Structure formats: C-alpha cells, structure tokens
Swiss-Prot record:
Location of the protein in the cell: Cytoplasm
Entry-linked Pfam families: Anticodon_1, tRNA-synt_1, tRNA-synt_1_2, tRNA-synt_1g
Source organism: Maricaulis maris (strain MCS10)
Catalysis: reaction(s): tRNA(Leu) + L-leucine + ATP = L-leucyl-tRNA(Leu) + AMP + diphosphate
Protein's name in the database: Leucine--tRNA ligase
DNA-binding recorded as keyword: no
Length: 865
C-alpha cells in the first residue's frame, strides 16, 4: 500500500470542508435545537509569521471545537486579529511601509498559515481590530461608558524621552534610558484617559470564587493584583504649623497592619508628593533626590529591584497613639504617589522593605509582633523582618493580643482619637488607556476652548485614522498632522481640536469575543440576542502571560457593557473555562560573535554545532520558549511542507501535559512522522471486502472480542482525556490502540468485522487531533460522507469491564511478547490468540512448534525446534 502523503491529502480535505461550510456556526434560530459551545483561543497579533510554538495554542482549541462538534454541539470557533499596536509603527519607521499595509500583509500571510494547519474555524466571522468597521463600535462603546461616568481624564505620569519627544511604555525604558535614543528618560505629567475599573474592584474579586474552571494560579494572580485588603487609614499630625496650614493638619496613610503602629520609626513620602515638592524648592539635596527618582522606572518590578534610597525631609509628625512621640519624615524611592496616599509609615521589624531602609539609614527597629513559640526575652530582628501573625508586645494597650484582635483594637483606638478609621484598600488602580501613538483606535472626543471635552456624535463615527502620515520623526504623527486634528465643536460649532491620543490595544481585546457573536451587526457592537445566546465563552485558551491584564480588563468590560444595557448576561463573566497552555521550547544558538542563530543556520554534528555559513563553532544555549528575538523558532510552513499539518498538531500535543512546556526536537518530529505512517498502514491492512467503519461486531469472541475490548477502552479513555484537557494522555491511548491493531491479523470474518469496527472507532477518535489523516482513513474504510460529520462513538459499557489478563509469551524460554486474554479463558482460545500474534509468528519462522504450554491466567511458553 502507498505511504500516506499529506501534501495530497491535506489540501483535498480542506477544500472539502470549505465546500460545505463545515465549521460555520448556526446560532440562535427556531430550527436549531443543538446546545451551543463557544471555544476561543486568544486572537493573535499579526506580527508576520506563525511558528510551531504558536500552533500549540490554536491546536488545543481546535481539538475541543472538533470534539464538541462531533458530540452534537453547535460550535462557535472564530478567528480574528488584534491588529493595532506599536510594532506596526516601528515597521513603518524601519521599512518605510504604512502600518496598515504592513498589518494587512501579515494578516493575509498568517491567515493562510492557520488555514493550512487545518483549523476548524468559522472564517465568516473574521475581524481585525484595525478595521474602521470594528473600531467604529469601540468608539461607540467609549462614548457609552463615558456617558455612564466610567471614563475620566486626569493628569498622570508617563515616561518621556526628551530626544525622541515621545512617551515610552515601561518596557521601552531600559536601565532608565529610551530604547531607541538612549537618552535618560524623565517622568512627565500629561492629561490621560482612564477607565474607572476600580468601581468594579469588589465585584471582580468576589466573582473569582465562581470561576471553578479557571486555574487556581490565575485566580490568585488576579486577586493579588486587585489587592483588596482590610486595614486602617491613619492620620499623623504634622508638627510644622506652616506645612499644616499649607497641606492640611495631618499626613494620611493607609496600612493593612495598624497593629504594628508601635513599631513605627519613620514616615516616607513619594518623591513627587506635594510636601516633598514644596520642601525641594528650598533644599538642593531634596530637589536632586526628587529629580533622580523621576528618571527611575515606574513598574512595581523595577521599584522592587531598585536599591532602597531616601532623603530626610527634616520634618516630623506625631504618633497617633502618643502626642509626645515624634517620627521623622523621609522621602523614599519605593513609595509611589499613585498607590494609596503616596505616604507610608515604616515599621521595620514587620516589613522587609522598611527593614532594609531602616538599616541603611540607621533608623530604629522595634519588634512588636512575637512569633508563635518565640520568647520575648530572646526574639530579635536582624536581617530578616517577621511578617507573619503572632502576639503583640512592646505595644502598650495591644500587648498580649493576637494579630487579628490587635488589628481591630488599634482601629477602635484610632477612631476614638479621631486620628483614623477602619478602611478597605485596593492595589488596583484605574486603567490608563491613553497612548500617544498613531496606530490605535482614535478617541472620539473634540476639545473646545468654550465647551471643554465634547463627545463626537455617534452618527459621525467612526473617527478614522488619516492615511497621509509620516514616520520621519518619533513623535505622534496625529499630533503633527496638519489638518486631521482640526474639527468643529459639535456643541457650539467653533473651531476645536480632535483628541490625538489613541486607545490602549488592551481595549480592543476586552470585547472582541462579543463582536464574534454577530460581526455583521452594523448599528450596534453586537446583537444582544446573539451575545446572550453564545456567551459566556465555554472554553478560552491562551498563555499565562495574560493572566492579569487582558483577562481582568475583559471581565471589567463585560460587566460594564452589561450594566450599560448592551446585553443582559446572567453572569458578568466572559470566560466560563480558561486553560493556560505551556510553551513549545527549543535550544538556542549563538554564533562566535554573539549573534543569535536560527536552527536552519546551524549544523548539529557529533563533535559539536557549527554555523553553516562560516563553519565556526556555535554555542548551544538553554532550552527556552520559541521567540523571534532569540531566533529559536521553527517555521510552521516549513514543518507542514516536510511532514504535514497533522504531524505538527500531533507533535505539539504529544509527550507533555498541555499546561507544561514541550521541547521541540528533530527526533521527536521524526517519531511523529513514523507514527503517522504506521497508523495509515494499519488502516490500509484490512483485506478488500471488509464491512464499513460503523460495523458493530457483536458476535465476536476470543481474539476478536479482545480487539473490540481494546478499541472501546481506548474510546472511553480518549473521551475522558479530551474532556479533562489531557491531550497527551489521549495521544498515548491512540498509540496503544494502533500497536494492538497492528499486531492483530484476523483469520475469519468475525475477526475482520472486529478489526473494522476498531478502525472505524480509531478514525473518529483521531479526527479532533489529526483531521486530514482521519478523513483519509474514513474514506479508505468506506465511511459515508466526511468523518467530521460522523457522530462521536459511544463506548460499550460491557466491553469496559476489567475481565482480562495480560499473559507473557515465551518462545523456547525467551520472552517475545504478551497477549491480553479473558480471565479463565480456555487453553485452546489462548493458544489461538498467541499463534495469531505477528511477533510470535516472526519468532517461529523456520521452526516447528512441538508444544504450547498454557498456564491459565499466568504465562504461555512455546517449545519449537
């Protein structure tokens, strides 16, 4: 029989699926009584090419989509493009191509790659967030949420590159310098737009408990990011009457540990706190410190990594529990004005950051919480703070109380003294969505000198990006455009100015899953009836790197749109199930001069790796996730050209649990290719005239019955594995079944029927994984229509009962193989099974069987000579 040829089979079956719109979702209709199932992978950014690492995400979602379709569901499995973003502008600068042209060329290329991968996608619903037909509705959503008070504009700090004259994202600041210019970055305050996500902080936190089909790790990450915590607002009276008159009588601080107030040894203010700014005007040291901090990175990670630095402001405050106790006030680089009040009190014995700061500047360290089992006489704090619970001591009226009781008692005392109160605080801040970029969704407002900020009327949407822009200067092209920003005020008709900021691309990805439910809707972002039918997404698949921002913003948006009346979902949760897949990894390679090399540029020899173009030695580095920056990617098209799409799919699902990384190796790929051929040869080994693949060999007995039993057990196990997202387990079950079927050579019609039934089951259970090969097998077996239209088989419970034993088979005392037989099977039945085994037959070639010894349920020994 000929070998399986994916170059012929895969285009053939993809054309067949396209011809009948096989994967087009039906949606809500009176004639559709199928249950719905919405499966979605996080849509890609069209960066140019999809590599093998990317394919794992889409393949996993595709397995679920195809499986659910076979189980009788009406499946929505769409695809689109997260198409705005900075890389397109960088390409415009570096290559002289318009961002739109670059983006759409990439979309065309990547769409072709996904189609060649054989994904069961409903392409009729394809969207791209850079198309005006999409962002028109995003602008309408912006105006609706603005009307509801969920948007506001205020000044906020940004990273400003003084050479490129542009705002930089945090990741574009490297060691305090702009990534392109190398200039020292400074902090600037600009007017920015914010979504009031904080208004949903409690709801977003509480609802995490309901997401029982999300990974615990992701729920914990979101909970920590929102950071709801019970504590107290504490007021420290200023001792300087002049400052008190100018800035208020107290410096207010939020703390989660008011029980440690008696361990306080200092207050610290953010470098840009109003009091610090006022004092800096007359103190060069404070002024210098303030400006040095303005050049620091602003992410929590950067702040945490930076050495702790501060400056004594030369002022003091009174302790709220003792008016005779004065605490020095410092400014510290680890205090941020955007968090809380921009002020903290330092209790060094109970906080590592405070302890590091106190040791550096020789501030007092007073332990106030005694750990369990510790002694007050011997407990000391040296280089490590104690942050856990315990018993209060050195704390006057709190002495002897547990941490929980001391916290409540401290709040009661603060409230009695009118110097504080119990409060709940959140780490979450309102979502800054302004970007000083061209390639993004325009913000639909006009600035008028008389009327202020005026929304663009909805009948004038979309506000479309101008095409005639240049990228010869790094600043925002919209700001420099000679005419686009000029617009009349919709209220008074006077000359106004368009907003030249665009929206954060996370806004685009915060509602795209809703647009997929009715992408043809012209008057509304989506049809409420369709959204209510399809939502929530039943299974969402994507990387752990999106665990916080994207998923949190999407949860906020769904609630906000629900509350705005655009739909009436029972739950505000957009994703009922979430799976975060592992990466595909690969060795990394560096040339002798330190440049990253792709696998295609390296010759792996027994005596070491060399660069093909130079013959020079190559350094083989760590196995890391495939990334373009390190060039350790394997091109998807090249893989498909060599081995076929099904081999890609099978490889990325094999060996490793889907939540873990899987390593790309040439040997692993070759193993997959051999298995594909082995499976095909097993299917084509049936004799001509065999019955069709829906055969049920109900009368099978002996070896034929065991073949049926193996097939139904594999069916049951694969079904269970897919339902549990254990795709590697399903792959292993298929391997085992193929091995069993290869060894079985039927000797009569009952055996042929049993093997045909088993192969029919095999063709259907591999269809979600290797759909082209499954179609080819189904056709060869004589199946009617397409295998994707065949119902998922049901395992016969009677065949799942464990009533068989595995018997080792020896030939002349040497173990050759093993067979599975019914418990207590008669010796002649076991002997027939053994003699039909191909491995046994090969071992007996040229020999005469003299005796077959069957020890019931134990072992079989063949004596031959």
């Amino acid at each position: 029989m000929t070998r399986y040829n994916p170059r012929e089979a895969e285009p053939k079956w993809q054309s067949a699926w396209d011809a009948c719109d096989a994967f087009k979702a039906i949606g809500p209709s009176a004639s559709n009584n199928k249950p719905k199932y919405y499966v979605l992978e996080m849509f890609p950014y069209p960066s140019g090419r999809i590599h093998v690492g990317h394919s794992r995400n889409y393949t996993m979602g595709d397995v679920v989509a195809r499986y659910k379709r076979a189980r009788g569901f009406d499946v929505l499995h769409p695809m689109g493009w997260d198409a705005f973003g900075l890389p397109a502008e960088n390409a415009a600068r570096d290559r002289g191509v318009h961002p739109g042209a670059w983006t759409h060329d990439n979309i065309d290329a990547m769409r072709g790659q996904l189609q060649r991968l054989g994904l069961a996608l409903d392409w009729s619903r394809e969207i791209a967030t850079c198309d005006p037909s999409y962002y028109r509705h995003q602008q309408a959503i912006f105006l609706r949420l603005m009307e509801r008070g969920l948007l506001h504009r205020k000044t906020a700090k940004v990273n400003w590159d003084p050479v490129d004259q542009t705002v930089l994202a945090n990741e574009q600041v490297i060691d305090g310098r702009g990534w392109r210019s190398g200039a020292l970055v400074v902090q600037r305050e600009l007017d920015q737009w914010f979504f009031k996500i904080t208004e949903y902080a409690d709801e977003l936190t509480d609802a995490l408990e309901e997401l029982d089909r999300w990974p615990d790790k992701v729920r914990t990450m979101q909970s920590n990011w929102i950071g709801r915590s019970r504590g107290a607002e504490v007021s420290f009276p200023l001792t300087d009457s002049g400052l008190a008159e100018q800035f208020g009588a107290t410096i207010d601080v939020f703390t989660t540990r008011p029980d440690t107030l008696f361990g306080a040894s200092f207050l610290a203010l953010a470098p840009d706190h109003p009091i610090v700014k006022a004092l800096a005007a007359d103190d060069p040291e404070i002024d210098r410190f303030m400006h040095e901090c303005a050049r620091m990175g602003t992410t929590a990670e950067e702040i945490e990594k930076a050495p702790k630095r501060g400056v004594d402001l030369g002022i003091t405050v009174r302790h709220p529990f003792d008016e005779n106790w004065e605490l020095p006030v410092w400014s510290a680089n680890f205090v941020l004005s955007g968090y809380g009040t921009g002020a903290i009190f330092g209790s060094p014995a109970g906080d590592q950051r405070d302890l590091d700061f106190a040791r550096k500047y020789d501030l007092a360290v007073q332990p106030v919480v005694l750990p369990p089992e510790a002694s007050a006489d011997t407990h000391v704090i040296e280089d490590e703070a104690y942050t856990g619970p315990g018993t209060s001591y050195n704390s006057r009226f709190l002495d002897g109380l547990s941490t929980a009781d001391a916290l409540e008692r401290a709040i009661t005392e603060l409230e009695a003294r009118k110097l504080g109160k119990g409060a709940t605080s959140y780490r979450l801040r309102d979502w800054l969505v302004s970007r000083q970029r061209y390639w993004g969704c325009p913000i639909p407002v006009i600035h008028c000198a008389d009327c202020g900020v005026v929304p663009v009327p909805e009948d004038q949407l979309p506000v479309v990006l101008p095409e005639d822009v240049t990228f010869d200067h790094p600043s925002n092209p919209l700001e420099r455009h000679p005419t686009w920003k000029n617009a009349d005020c919709p209220k008074c008709g006077k000359a106004g100015r368009r907003e030249t900021d665009t929206l954060d691309t996370f806004v685009c990805s915060s509602w795209y899953f809703l647009r997929f439910t009715s992408p043809w809707s012209e008057d509304t972002p989506f049809l409420a009836s369709d959204a209510e039918h399809w939502m929530p997404v039943d299974q969402y698949v994507g990387g752990i790197e999106h665990a916080i921002l994207h998923l949190l913003y999407a949860r906020f948006f769904t609630r906000a749109l629900n509350d705005a009346g655009l739909m009436n979902m029972k739950s505000g949760e957009p994703f009922a199930g979430l799976f975060t897949q592992g990466m595909v990894t690969h060795e990394t390679y560096k040339s002798a001069d330190g440049k990253w090399l792709s696998p295609e540029e390296v010759d792996l020899r027994k005596d070491g790796a060399v660069e093909m173009s130079t013959g020079k030695p190559v350094s083989v580095g760590a196995i890391e996730k495939m990334s373009k920056s390190k060039k350790n990617v394997v091109d998807l098209d090249a893989f498909i050209e060599s081995y076929g799409a099904d081999a890609v799919r099978w490889f990325v699902l094999s060996d490793s649990p889907p939540e873990r990384d899987v390593e790309y190796t040439d040997s692993g790929v070759e193993g997959v290719w051999r298995f594909v051929q082995r499976l095909w040869s097993t299917v084509t080994s049936l004799p001509e005239g065999a019955p069709g693949p829906l055969t049920v060999a109900a009368d099978a007995s002996g070896p034929a019955l065991e073949i049926r039993r193996a097939a139904h057990k594999a069916l049951h196990a694969v079904t269970d594995a897919i339902e549990g997202f254990r795709f590697n387990s399903a792959v292993a079950q298929v391997h085992d079944l193929v091995n069993v079927l290869r060894k079985y050579v039927p000797s009569d019609d009952a055996g042929i029927a049993a093997k045909t039934e088993a192969l029919g089951i095999l063709a259907r259970i591999i269809a979600p994984f290797v759909p082209h090969l499954a179609e080819e097998c189904w056709e060869h077996l004589g199946g009617e229509g397409l295998v994707i239209d065949a119902a998922w088989p049901e395992a016969d419970p009677a065949l799942l009962v464990e009533d068989s034993v595995t018997l080792p088979v020896q030939v002349n005392g040497k173990r050759r193989t093993e067979v599975t037989a019914p418990k207590g099977a008669a010796q002649d039945v076991v002997q027939e099974m053994v003699m039909a085994d191909q491995t046994v037959q090969r071992a007996l070639e040229g020999l005469t069987v003299r005796k077959v010894i069957v020890v019931p349920d134990r072992i079989v020994n063949i004596v031959a000579g």
